[in-house]
Amino acid sequence: MNLIDCHERRPNNWGNHCGASRVAVAAYLGDTTQLARAAKVFKGYLGDRASYAGFVYGSDLSWQCDPSAPVGINPMNCTIGSSQVGGILPDDQRRAGPFSWPPPKENYVYEGLQGAMAEAVILKRAGYDPFNWENKALLRAFQWLQTQANFLATGDDTWLPHLVNYYYGKGTLPSTVPSRPGKNVGWTDWTLPPR
């Protein structure tokens, strides 16, 4: 599997890290065709199945809002029973097991968001608007982790809230200073001070 295959097949942390690498290469090379394709795939991951729906999901779809039309991030106002699941990254959350409430604190979700946020920043700098796509899907993912899962960023995920606060507004998420670098980005507490 190459970088493009990974990005276009894996709706989880692997696919998001591959997507971040893919858009970084395309942006660096000025390959607008590749960048446009990667943006469509990312928009599909965020929930716009009309943009892209070619992902291969794991067998457990119990965290999906609509198992017949799975997405990378559940849509706004989605519930399973009486539980609010809008904003979940279902293919990463499933790694903690089938749907249960209260939700398990599954770190793969943060790993998926590490790749997704890096991808979003590069796309933003290339002229796209990923932070607003699908009713601010990325923001909703972090809000779900904070409010529904009561799971704040720790360890190598602490750079993420600084990025969220930079793009969505100061104080959106509690942030740690100093933060730790993640798998693909770091030092956001220094490079992205509150605006």
Show which residues each predicted segment covers.
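CBM-like carbohydrate-recognition segments
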Residues: 104-105, 125, 129-195
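Aromatic-lined, polymer-binding surfaces characteristic
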Residues: 1-126
